[in-house]
Curated annotation (Swiss-Prot):
Family: Belongs to the SUA5 family. TsaC subfamily.
UniProt GO MF annotations: ATP binding; double-stranded RNA binding; L-threonylcarbamoyladenylate synthase; tRNA binding
Encoding gene (name): tsaC
Protein's organism: Coxiella burnetii (strain Dugway 5J108-111)
Descriptive protein name: Threonylcarbamoyl-AMP synthase
Task of the protein: Required for the formation of a threonylcarbamoyl group on adenosine at position 37 (t(6)A37) in tRNAs that read codons beginning with adenine. Catalyzes the conversion of L-threonine, HCO(3)(-)/CO(2) and ATP to give threonylcarbamoyl-AMP (TC-AMP) as the acyladenylate intermediate, with the release of diphosphate.
Places the protein is found: Cytoplasm
Length: 186
């Protein structure tokens, strides 16, 4: 990870200044920003041509970064979630009052993944908090796995690209309900 130290530091600086970045994840390039910066989230919505009603996934390097954004759930259900993390699995939790409405959208839940991707995890660690993780595509388009295509599609609309290898998964992560285990997206 030493090869990426400067790039990660630059990405963190960009995030703290309210920028929108692209970064590698378990499956595809993700677009993200500080989830607590409303202006940055508004910019991301514009870039993706996405409705605020849909909500966003948050990634974190560890559970404690996102736990305050969730309401407590049954310990057995939480154990089932923890069995899949860190890893390419996104779970929806009942959202707490701490979860910004521009992250949850029209939902009463918040979607969270504790990432196993080394660069995404390090990015969250250095940022000291969760990040929005939305597939690098415009609404309805295919997710991007190639940095050259990422540059062609988004050009100067994003503030920083953190280049790096993608994870071994070739599709966006599945989403499941943390309480019921129901699959919401495969």
């Amino acid at each position: 990870m030493d090869d990426y130290t400067q790039s990660i530091n630059d990405a963190v600086k960009c995030l703290r200044q309210g920028g929108v970045i692209a970064y590698p994840t378990e499956a595809v390039y993700g677009l993200g920003c500080d989830p607590f910066n409303h202006d940055a989230v508004a910019q991301l919505l514009t870039i993706k041509k996405r409705s605020i009603k849909k909500g966003f996934i948050l990634i974190a390097s560890e559970w404690k970064q996102v736990e305050p954004l969730t309401e407590p759930i049954d310990p057995k259900a939480l154990a089932r979630v923890f069995d899949t993390w860190p890893g390419p699995f996104t779970w929806t939790f009942p959202a707490s009052k701490e979860a910004p409405h521009w992250i949850t959208g029209q939902h009463s839940t918040i979607a969270i993944r504790v990432t196993a991707h080394p660069l995404a995890k390090l990015l969250c660690q250095r940022f000291a908090g969760p990040l929005i993780s939305s597939s690098a595509n415009q609404e309805g388009g295919p997710p991007i796995r190639d940095v050259k295509i990422l540059r062609l599609v988004f050009g100067n609309k994003i503030d920083k690209i953190l280049e790096g290898p993608l994870g071994p998964t070739h599709r966006p992560t599945p989403i499941r309900d943390a309480i019921t285990g129901e699959i919401l997206r495969l």
